[in-house]
Amino acid sequence: MRNFAIGLLLLTLGSVIVQPLIEIVNLGREKIILSTAVITSARSAKDRSLEYKSQRDLNAVVNEKLFAEYFSDAFMKSMNLSLVNADGINKYRFKPQDDKYNDIIVTLDFVEVGDGVSDQFVTTVKMRTETEYKYKTKAMKIVETMGNNASNNLVEEQTLILSIKN
């Protein structure tokens, strides 16, 4: 009977220790998925939104509206999302169709500067993606409901530098 009690205690302690570790692995996985979706969407939008007239002069001038449109379209398809609203061309709110994530907010900032050496223009796009992390394991969901209501945000920031080289 004593061995049975010790085995039960070890099993309980093992599950208490393992569940947060599983949640950390899930958090890393979600961060990788979000990062990959942002990078892929940005690459898709960059190629299609550069203005042709500026490309002839080796200037990387981006049509911001087209970039945002292509980016949001590719991001929606890659993460299985639907667009809730767009605040101008710089801020988008997406809602997941499969209830896998919480609402995702994407902010795009465009900066167009000269490169300082020649007369070329370089465009920098800063993308910030933010969502509240949704716990996957049952124990962590219970801890979240009993907790201090502190939100655990999952934030991904990427910078895309667009330049044209001769």
PLM region spans:
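Alpha-helical assembly-interface signal, strongest on the long, hydrophobic N-terminal helix that forms
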Residues: 1-69
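Short, conserved structural patches
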Residues: 48-166
